Amino acid sequence: MARLLQASCLLSLLLAGFVSQSRGQEKSKMDCHGGISGTIYEYGALTIDGEEYIPFKQYAGKYVLFVNVASYUGLTGQYIELNALQEELAPFGLVILGFPCNQFGKQEPGENSEILPTLKYVRPGGGFVPNFQLFEKGDVNGEKEQKFYTFLKNSCPPTSELLGTSDRLFWEPMKVHDIRWNFEKFLVGPDGIPIMRWHHRTTVSNVKMDILSYMRRQAALGVKRK
């Protein structure tokens, strides 16, 4: 119980610095549906070097943040913030997973072998190296979308009613639950069930605040059960 109380106090302190930033951001986040059938642990993906298939059940008991990423996007700077998020919340059980995709404005044009060098020397550049796992480039929407993204999208309402400019979106057929752009995010809980979905323009600091708020609520529930 002492550990749960300590975790709750730490989360409260972290949240205190982000309350003011959360106002007006509610529409940038959607809670996922209740009564979801199945879990993310039924799926997995190949690492960016193609050398290892990682079943997502490896992350059982962790909070997992799924992010579709791109190297030549106006939001590519989020990589730096995601590194900071991973480092800060890893002690609380957060794991970030990145999935390169070229379906939005053709902003991830390179081969898998080119993505890490691009991040290091071009964008964000400056020797940047992600501290979270990246997987092989693939589709998140359309006929060839990765199956775990089908599961995530069907589990959570879309973050916007509009898909965007059709000449910058490269998949068919287009569906209401589709991901709108690079750097949209899904949070999956320790039980493998999706919890939240964020619009791509939601700041990482607000994503962080939402995650901490949820963790704090869960920690409080754990204390009450004791």
Swiss-Prot record:
Residues 1-20 form the signal peptide. One of its GO terms (biological process) is response to lipid hydroperoxide. It catalyses: 2 glutathione + H2O2 = glutathione disulfide + 2 H2O; tert-butyl hydroperoxide + 2 glutathione = tert-butanol + glutathione disulfide + H2O. One of its GO terms (cellular component) is extracellular space. InterPro entries: Glutathione_peroxidase, GPX_AS, GPX_CS, Thioredoxin-like_sf. Secreted in plasma. SUPFAM superfamilies: Thioredoxin-like. Pfam families: GSHPx. Keywords: Oxidoreductase, Peroxidase, Secreted, Selenocysteine, Signal. Transmembrane segments: none annotated. The N-terminus is blocked. Its EC number is 1.11.1.9. It is found in: Secreted. The active site is at U73. CDD domains: GSH_Peroxidase. GO terms for molecular function: glutathione peroxidase activity; identical protein binding; selenium binding. Coiled coil: none annotated. Belongs to the glutathione peroxidase family. Protects cells and enzymes from oxidative damage, by catalyzing the reduction of hydrogen peroxide, lipid peroxides and organic hydroperoxide, by glutathione. PANTHER family: GLUTATHIONE PEROXIDASE, GLUTATHIONE PEROXIDASE 3. Homotetramer. This is Glutathione peroxidase 3. It comes from Homo sapiens.
